[in-house]
Structures are given as C-alpha cells and as structure tokens.
C-alpha cells in the first residue's frame, strides 16, 4: 500500500523546457530552481535539464549544492549575495550574481578577488522590492562598469510585478523604463519570468527566466492551466486508499461533523493530510482521482487523512491509487478550490512525502 508520494516526471520536465524554447525562440533560458526547484528536488531537476542555458536560485547555499552535485552550467543568484564574505566563493565557483543595492556595490568595490564576477544589475522598474531606482541607476551602472571585480559588460535584469494582468498597463510602463535605461548599453538583458514568457513576447530579450511554468503550472490566476500553453504537469501528488467504509444517509464525517451524507454511500479514507502539506483549507467538494475517476473530498482535512465520497456503487478497495493533483487533475484546480496559490501548494509538501522520479 502506497503512502504519500510525489512523482516527478522527468520527461514532462524536458518537454516543458523545449516548449518554452518554442515560446521564446530568441532567448536563452535560466531554469529557475529556487525553493528546491519549486518542490521538485533541486539536484535531480537540474540534472534532468542539462540543456538549460543557466539555472537561477535564491540563495548561495542552493548554488553551492548545485555545484557539489556536478552542475557546471552558469548559476544566477537572483537575490544577489547577502554578505561581503560571500564574494570570494561566488568568484571561485563562477556564479553570476544580481546586484541591487549600495551595500553590495561597495562590497564589490572593496573586495580582493582572484577573478572578476559576472554581475546582473537589478533595476527597479516598478516591483519596488529589490533594485536600483531609475533616478539612481545611471551612476550605479557607471560604478559597476569601472569596478575591477566586475566582469564586463554589466548585465541588466528586472522583474515584472503584474505580468499576469495583461490589461493593467503596469507591464508596459515597466518595459518602457527598462528599455530606456538599457538603450545603448552592451550587456545582456532579462526581465521576463513565467508570465512574461507567456504573455509579453516583447519582453523576452536575451534571457528569460521560467519558474513555475517550467514545472507545467500556469502562473496566471485566470482559470488557465499549464496545458493551455502546451506544458505538462511534472509533479503528481499520490497516495492510496487505506479503508473503504459503508456510510449511512444522515451521518456526519470527520472533525466537527461539517459534512453529512444525503444518501447511503461508500466512503474512502486516503492516507494524506495537512501533515503532508495538503491544504487544510480544502473544502468538501475538492476533487481527487481514485482509480482515475474524480470524486469529492468530504469533511475536514485532518493531519494524516482525508475522506472522499466514492459513491453508492463504488467497487474501490483499500490499496487503490489516489491522485491529489498532477496528471489528470491540474494543481491549478486545487488552488482555485482551496484559495491557496499553486505556487504554495507545490512548494510546501513536507518531508514525510516520499519523492520518486519517473520517465
């Protein structure tokens, strides 16, 4: 009997990288593998994508794990470095780093490095989280251009705040600021992440940075799924039935008795709960697949178990397979039902969920 297991489909991952090349044919791709590759496993994901032009991570520790795992492709520190003492390691490991504030710039100017570092100056075009403000950007850029520890030319990166809202006008404004600053500068440019790749072809530039869409999940919250863009789900969260029970009409189920059956039926108990990372907020009616057919969750999600209404004539039995999301049941549907973003669902599975890679 299978306990909670997440299946990672390597073939789908490779397919998605190729599909993104088709969507952004003039761009090189930074495969974003931060946060344990969005819950898919950092090292195995990178090893599955040897043709990625580079990898993007949030922390130096992630980059060093990739290097220790044999990954030799360029690795970009999307948040830059946190301490000046990190710079010798960044140089020695040939990492690329974002630079987005005065403290980082001063650290670069003062460092004693054996080799210069490839730098991506982060321009704040409207996200207002990290980055150099446009009115300060030219002077910042000139200092980077004159810094002995920076491999020239300086590259320029930014990030969209509302790429998933094509009617907002915010993305066009960010693009205008980005294009104005980059004009005449020789470095590489990058602003498009998943939403930019899908909706804003004019933003693809030299490098694009696919994140969640690389894993077959739509970054948009408009009812679309990764399949709508030609991508395949890489992660399937699976488990099995551990019991099947007869249940009488009028009887409640689970903590608080929040669901009461209107008919005699058969209930299945699934070895999955919020202790595995499944959302406790999932309401009755949230779908799962049992033996390939859709059935609803009933009652509250518990730490270790959920109950599903199999139907009065169901022939399912203990040990039968269950898919909570993934192949045949897009995680975007679960996100819509639970009001928990797909980003959070796929990255928050706990350590007791086994991970298995399949082709």
UniProtKB/Swiss-Prot annotation:
SMART domains reported in the protein's UniProt record: Ala_racemase_C (SM01005)
Keyword Isomerase set for record: yes
GO MF assignments: alanine racemase activity; pyridoxal phosphate binding
Pfam assignment, any one: Ala_racemase_N
GO cellular component, one term: cytosol
Cofactor: pyridoxal 5'-phosphate
N6-(pyridoxal phosphate)lysine sites (modified residues): 34
GO terms classed as biological process: cell wall organization; D-alanine biosynthetic process; peptidoglycan biosynthetic process; regulation of cell shape
Chain positions recorded as substrate binding sites: 129, 303
The protein's annotated pathway: Amino-acid biosynthesis; D-alanine biosynthesis; D-alanine from L-alanine: step 1/1; Cell wall biogenesis; peptidoglycan biosynthesis
Reaction equation(s) it catalyzes: L-alanine = D-alanine
EC number in record: 5.1.1.1
UniProt-annotated catalytic positions: 34, 255
PROSITE patterns attached to this UniProt entry: ALANINE_RACEMASE
Domain of life, source organism: Bacteria
Keywords of the record: Cell shape, Cell wall biogenesis/degradation, Isomerase, Peptidoglycan synthesis, Pyridoxal phosphate
NCBIfam families the UniProt entry points to: alr
Family: Belongs to the alanine racemase family.
General function of this protein: Catalyzes the interconversion of L-alanine and D-alanine. Provides the D-alanine required for cell wall biosynthesis.
Name of the protein: Alanine racemase, biosynthetic
């Amino acid at each position: 009997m299978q306990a909670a297991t997440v299946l990672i489909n390597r073939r789908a991952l490779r397919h998605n990288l190729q599909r993104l090349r088709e969507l952004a044919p003039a761009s090189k791709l930074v495969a974003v593998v931060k946060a344990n590759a969005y819950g898919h496993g950092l090292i195995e994901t990178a090893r599955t994508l040897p043709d990625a032009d580079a990898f993007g991570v949030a922390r130096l520790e992630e980059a060093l794990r990739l290097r220790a795992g044999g990954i030799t492709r360029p690795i970009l520190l999307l948040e830059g470095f946190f301490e000046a003492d990190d710079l010798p390691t960044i140089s020695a490991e040939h990492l690329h780093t974002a630079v987005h504030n005065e403290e980082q710039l001063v650290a670069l100017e003062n460092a004693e490095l054996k080799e210069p570092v490839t730098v991506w100056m982060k321009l704040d075009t409207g996200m207002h989280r990290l980055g150099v403000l446009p009115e300060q950007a030219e002077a910042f850029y000139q200092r980077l251009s004159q810094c002995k520890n920076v491999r020239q030319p300086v590259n320029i990166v930014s990030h969209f705040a509302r790429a998933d809202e094509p009617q907002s006008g915010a993305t066009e404004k960010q693009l205008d600021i980005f294009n104005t600053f980059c004009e005449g500068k020789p470095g590489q440019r990058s602003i498009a992440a998943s939403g930019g790749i899908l909706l804003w072809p004019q933003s693809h530039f030299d490098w694009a940075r696919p994140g969640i869409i690389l894993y077959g999940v739509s970054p948009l919250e408009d009812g679309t799924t990764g399949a709508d863009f030609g991508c395949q789900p890489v992660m399937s969260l699976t488990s099995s039935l551990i019991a099947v029970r007869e249940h009488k009409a009028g009887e409640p189920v689970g903590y608080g008795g929040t669901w009461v059956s209107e008919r005699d039926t058969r209930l299945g108990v699934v070895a999955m709960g919020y202790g595995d990372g499944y959302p406790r907020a999932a309401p009755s009616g949230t779908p799962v697949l049992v033996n390939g057919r859709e059935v609803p969750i009933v009652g509250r999600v518990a730490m270790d178990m959920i109950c599903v209404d199999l139907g009065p004539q169901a022939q399912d039995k203990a040990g039968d397979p269950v898919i909570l999301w993934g192949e045949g049941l897009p995680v975007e549907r679960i996100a819509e039902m639970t009001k928990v973003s797909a980003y959070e669902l796929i990255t928050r599975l706990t350590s007791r969920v086994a991970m298995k890679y399949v082709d």
